Regions:
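Hydrophobic alpha-helical transmembrane segments of multi-pass integral membrane proteins
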Residues: 1-230
């Protein structure tokens, strides 16, 4: 079935164009900053810069989080934009997604450069609590809260996309073009490729976000209540 397409006065389908442009600009700035971080670490490894080991690993932690975060942010924004050309999405959901993402970034940067958190990729239980005195538990908690805030934002975005696609194409199978794929529907009734991709991404990402959030919350509880074992 055909879904409603939202268009601007000029006739071009551009839902929340301003929000999308702002997000892509922010992602570009962060990506450039991560390149600077990467170059700084390489110069330190080559002996050109003299960085204290704790600062090196703080930069490494920020670099890893920033690169993954930038990839996720741009990917979700692009998916939102092209999905919005086929179904009317609620602009407030995207702003909530962006706000939670930025809040998470603030938490993560504060945990790293104010709290000294330098766990890099080893931020899951039980490693955040085993710092060797390099950072306090609150820094690890703040870091994990940052990831949790970002995850909640992504979950809101995916739920909005999934809700609208399911409603427009009569269910998950319809949005995935299964009736057409299995010979029960007409090719002309198949959803656009962007819709199929968005529905598939929404399913897998939603599952991953929920599981990941559960692990993060369990780790936070362990940091606050050490007797609690995950």
């Amino acid at each position: 079935m055909d879904a409603t397409i939202t268009t601007d006065p000029a006739g071009t389908a551009t839902p929340q164009t301003g929000a999308v442009k702002l997000t892509m600009l922010l992602a570009g700035v962060v990506f450039v900053l991560m390149m600077v971080f990467g170059l700084t670490m390489r110069l330190a490894q080559g002996g050109v810069l003299d960085l204290p080991p704790e600062l090196f690993y703080q930069i490494l932690t920020a670099h890893g989080a920033g690169m993954v975060g930038t990839a996720g942010l741009t990917g979700a924004t692009i998916m939102w934009y092209f999905t919005g050309r086929h179904v009317p999405l609620v602009a407030g959901v995207f702003w909530a997604f962006l706000g939670l993402f930025l809040l998470g970034v603030v938490f993560i940067l504060a945990a790293i450069f104010l709290g000294g958190f330098a766990g890099a990729w080893t931020f899951l239980f039980p490693l955040p609590a085993i710092s060797g005195g390099l950072w306090e538990p609150w820094a690890a908690v703040l870091f994990l809260l940052g990831y949790t805030a970002i995850g909640v934002g992504f979950l809101l975005l995916h739920l909005e996309i999934g809700r609208k696609l399911i409603g427009a194409w009569g269910g998950i199978s319809g949005a995935l073009a299964w009736p057409v794929a299995f010979g029960a529907g007409r090719p002309e009734d198949a959803p656009p490729p962007a819709v199929v991709a968005a529905m598939a991404s929404t399913i897998f990402n939603t599952i991953g976000i929920v599981v990941g959030a559960a692990v993060l919350v369990a780790s936070i509880v362990n940091l606050l209540v050490p007797s609690f074992a995950v």
